[in-house]
């Protein structure tokens, strides 16, 4: 089963078995390698549709988020939270803390001790989340990529939104834009209400807790235990919305 369906001359991104496609890709290249070892003749045939569109988008965006997140965290925490560590440990910590905001929410440092810039990187990574059909939360890298591609097309003044030589369908663009707008709307509403219920609390800390809850990450600046009962219920509701609400269906 491929991950994208043709709609006229357009390409419509759907939920797809990315891991299955990735497995097929690995097996294909292993077979080519085994054929070369047996015959010492390299099979030059290429199957250009081996990588489906969804797999390409997820792999590329995930790679970029990991690289940029790792470099960004390393730059801002090199002589701060990572001070006293070896160079190898600093890069390991940076990579680990760039990966976990989009997945399990594990942490190897006290998040409350991180700089504002690093926390903003955390917020962005938590908000984007993982790929579709994964257990990660967020708006999904697929929706994020489509929205960015649509923005690029608008800035260029073109009506067609293309990637890898194929045009994305209006349905994919519409669903992705709706997901992003809905995510921002829910976050703004809950952040606004909690900021009223918790006067004097840092707006950045409230935002961090809300984004973490909606993206079902689990990271915290140790604010939630100090919240009032009403605010805790709102945070719990955000977790529920992030897991079973429309945001999770992208």
List the predicted regions and their residue ranges.
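Membrane-proximal intracellular helices of multi-pass ion channels
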Residues: 3-4, 9-10, 14-249
């Amino acid at each position: 089963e491929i991950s994208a369906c043709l709609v006229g001359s357009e390409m419509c991104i759907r939920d797809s078995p990315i891991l299955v496609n990735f497995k097929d890709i690995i097996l294909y290249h292993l077979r080519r390698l085994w054929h070369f070892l047996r015959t010492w003749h390299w099979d030059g045939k290429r199957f250009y549709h081996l990588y489906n569109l969804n797999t390409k988008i997820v792999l590329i965006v995930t790679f970029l988020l990991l690289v940029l997140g790792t470099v960004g965290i390393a730059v801002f925490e090199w002589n701060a939270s990572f001070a006293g560590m070896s160079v190898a440990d600093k890069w390991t910590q940076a990579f680990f803390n760039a990966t976990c905001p989009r997945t399990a929410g594990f942490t190897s440092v006290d998040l409350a001790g991180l700089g504002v810039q690093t926390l903003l990187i955390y917020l962005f990574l938590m908000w984007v989340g993982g790929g579709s059909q994964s257990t990660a939360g967020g708006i999904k890298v697929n929706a994020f990529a489509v929205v960015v591609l649509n923005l690029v097309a608008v800035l260029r003044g073109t009506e067609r939104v293309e990637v890898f030589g194929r045009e994305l369908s209006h349905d994919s663009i519409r669903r992705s834009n709706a997901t992003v707008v809905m995510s921002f709307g829910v976050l703004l509403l809950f952040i606004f209400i909690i900021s009223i219920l918790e006067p004097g609390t840092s707006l950045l800390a409230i935002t961090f807790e809300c984004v973490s809850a909606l993206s079902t990450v689990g990271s915290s600046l140790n604010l939630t235990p100090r919240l009032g009962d009403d605010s805790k219920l709102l945070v719990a509701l955000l977790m529920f919305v992030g897991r079973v609400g429309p945001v999770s269906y992208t």
